[in-house]
Design a protein with these regions (language model features):
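Hydrophobic packing positions in regular secondary-structure scaffolds
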Residues: 1-364
């Protein structure tokens, strides 16, 4: 089961009040299909009894905020309050929220659909967001936290990141609702914090979660994180290689190696853990399936001769269509030297195919 599939099952189980194991049969369903079901269930839950909820929301307008907070906590409870929140004017909701204790607001956050209350969330003071986040971390409510990331302004997001430790941040990032927001999250962290997170990924066995983040940030951030990882000791990088191999995450790792500085890329290529035949086979397979030939060609000249021969041995079985993709990648990215090095290690029949393709693009 993919990481995304596991995350979607966790989220659906949470919404239904079930154990993830009870939904194990969904491991064979596409993650997006599980997400679609979850969104339909969410809509059904939050749209049920809408008229009654609107009457509750209207009632809060005619009583003082202090009394509304007391009613919310003592009579309505977190679940009902979560469903009413999106029906309140943001300023009114924030005024009530500032009178509620942090533990109750954390209860409410767990039940809330942030997409329906985005305007309210955006206006809650950053200090209060930090307090709620700390409470959610204490409860290990990573799924709830992940849902809020795309709805927090920068000051609030910064307060939230300061309230969590590295392990909690990685676990939250892996279940974030909108992965496109990961770049903004990473952008708030200085190099010291990023280095600490990389070490934590190794020490806490959270490389799969960390590599998932790398697949959703900008090219510049990918290179920065790759360079920071390459500066760590071999044990840290070997842990990343093992995770990429066991979880089949080379499609996430290869773009990182291309975005690295030349020195960092060379350091990665010199790792003995990268040079084994099973790992090289997985790298070549990822390049083939995800059209990552430029990433592989950039890495290839940096591998020791024995490792390059292993890659060439794997390439001997390629059909003409694969060789066409490789030559096209070399042509588009000016990686001819790397391709020629690769071709020099191939058996004569494959070399002949490469030579014919050279002529087709005017390189003869």
């Amino acid at each position: 089961m993919s990481l995304d599939g596991g995350v979607e099952i966790l989220k659906l189980a949470r919404l239904l009040g079930a154990e993830p194991e009870d939904l194990g049969y969904l491991q064979y369903v596409a993650p997006q299909d599980i997400r679609d079901v979850r969104e339909q269930v969410t809509a059904a839950i939050f749209d049920a009894d809408r008229q009654m909820l609107q009457r509750v929301a209207a009632a809060t307008k005619v009583i003082p905020s202090k009394l509304a907070a007391a009613v919310a906590q003592q009579a309505l409870g977190a679940l009902l309050c979560a469903r009413v929140t999106s029906l309140l004017e943001p300023a009114r909701a924030v005024d009530i929220a500032r009178r509620l204790p942090t533990d109750f607001l954390a209860d409410l956050a767990v039940e809330l659909d942030p997409r329906r209350a985005s305007r309210v969330i955006a206006e809650i003071p950053a200090r209060q967001i930090g307090q709620i986040t700390a409470e959610l971390v204490e409860r290990e409510e990573y799924i709830a936290m992940g849902g809020f990331v795309g709805h927090l302004p920068e000051a609030s997001l910064r307060a939230a990141t300061e309230a969590v430790d590295d392990e909690a941040l990685l676990l939250t990032a892996s279940v974030i609702e909108a992965k496109g927001n990961l770049g903004a999250l990473v952008g708030l962290l200085d190099e010291e914090r990023l280095e600490s997170i990389i070490r934590t990924a190794h020490e806490a066995d959270l490389w799969p979660e960390a590599l998932d983040v790398l697949g959703h940030v900008s090219e510049r951030q990918r290179g920065q994180l790759g360079d920071l990882a390459a500066a760590q000791e071999d044990a840290v990088l070997d842990g990343m290689v093992r995770a990429a191999q066991s979880e089949r995450l080379w499609a996430d790792v290869l773009p990182v190696t291309r975005a690295m500085s030349p020195d960092s890329r060379a350091r990665f290529a010199k790792l003995k853990s990268v040079q084994t035949r099973p790992v090289l086979a997985s790298i070549v397979d990822a390049a083939s399936q995800q059209h990552l030939w430029p990433e592989l060609l950039v890495l290839l000249p940096l591998l020791p001769a024995a490792a390059r021969r292993r890659v060439a041995a794997l390439g001997t079985g390629f059909g003409r269509s694969i060789f066409e993709q490789i030559v096209r990648a070399a042509d588009e990215h000016d990686l001819w030297d790397a391709l020629e090095l690769f071709a020099s290690e191939l058996e004569p029949g494959s070399q002949q195919q490469i030579e014919e393709l050279y002529k087709a693009v005017g390189r003869a």
